[in-house]
From Swiss-Prot:
It is found in: Cytoplasm. Cleaves peptides in various proteins in a process that requires ATP hydrolysis. Has a chymotrypsin-like activity. Plays a major role in the degradation of misfolded proteins. It comes from the Bacteria. This is ATP-dependent Clp protease proteolytic subunit. GO terms for cellular component: cytoplasm; endopeptidase Clp complex. Belongs to the peptidase S14 family. GO terms for molecular function: ATP-dependent peptidase activity; ATPase binding; serine-type endopeptidase activity. It comes from Shewanella loihica (strain ATCC BAA-1088 / PV-4). It catalyses: Hydrolysis of proteins to small peptides in the presence of ATP and magnesium. alpha-casein is the usual test substrate. In the absence of ATP, only oligopeptides shorter than five residues are hydrolyzed (such as succinyl-Leu-Tyr-|-NHMec, and Leu-Tyr-Leu-|-Tyr-Trp, in which cleavage of the -Tyr-|-Leu- and -Tyr-|-Trp bonds also occurs). Its EC number is 3.4.21.92. Keywords: Cytoplasm, Hydrolase, Protease, Serine protease. Its main location: cytoplasm.
Length: 203
């Protein structure tokens, strides 16, 4: 049974009706856009959302392995492991994944934005991008806390190296710039190498 907020949200999703040879067929707007190879990554990056994004990427690859996929991102970030599941799938599949920031791409959202196919990563003009180091918190015995601290440091180093590879920035610059929350405009994100261009009109 759906809870109240979920049922209200579903009621707000527009439906699209198409005429077919067999009569009318209705889709929710996201399913209709999926037919056009458009995926929306909206909200917190977490395991359930990651599974849905991964499934859509794999489905579109099976449909047409040589056609680009368009991933629209409006996210404050979230789980590193969930984000890496999406990132690894983006790199694994045959189609190029073009990323587009609408609204904001922060933290893991910014990482996924930068992880799109080279030359096909974009921001809309008034979007915002934010990069920083991974966050973590753990309670328990001192030895366990030390283990988790070591894990977070390892993740931080790995993400910094991957961002350096995607942006073309030196690793030491990435390490400095992700030490604290680092906000950028669309133009600044393009200059930094997180995206390739700022789009104000569809080409």
């Amino acid at each position: 049974m759906q809870n109240a907020p979920e049922s209200v949200l579903n009621a707000l999703v527009p439906m699209v009706v198409e005429q077919t040879a067999k009569g009318e067929r209705s889709y929710d707007i996201y399913s209709r856009l999926l037919k056009e190879r458009v995926i929306f990554l909206v909200g917190q990056v977490e395991e359930h959302m990651a599974n849905l994004i991964v499934a859509q990427l794999l489905f579109l690859e099976s449909e047409s392995p040589d056609k680009d996929i368009y991933l629209y991102i409006n996210s404050p970030g979230g789980s590193v492991t969930a984000g890496m599941a999406i990132y690894d799938t983006m790199q694994f599949i045959k189609p190029n994944v073009s990323t587009v920031c609408i609204g904001q791409a922060a933290s893991m959202g910014a990482f996924l934005l930068a992880g799109g196919a080279k030359g096909k990563r974009h921001c809309l003009p008034n979007s915002r991008v934010m990069i920083h180091q991974p966050l973590g918190g753990f309670q328990g015995q001192a030895s366990d806390i030390a283990i988790h601290a070591q894990e977070i440091l390892g993740i931080k180093n790995k993400l910094n190296q991957m961002l350096a590879d995607h942006t073309g920035q030196p690793l030491e610059v990435i390490e400095r710039d992700t030490d604290r929350d680092n906000f950028m405009s669309a133009t600044e994100a393009a200059e930094y190498g997180l995206v390739d261009s700022v789009l104000d009109k569809r080409g």
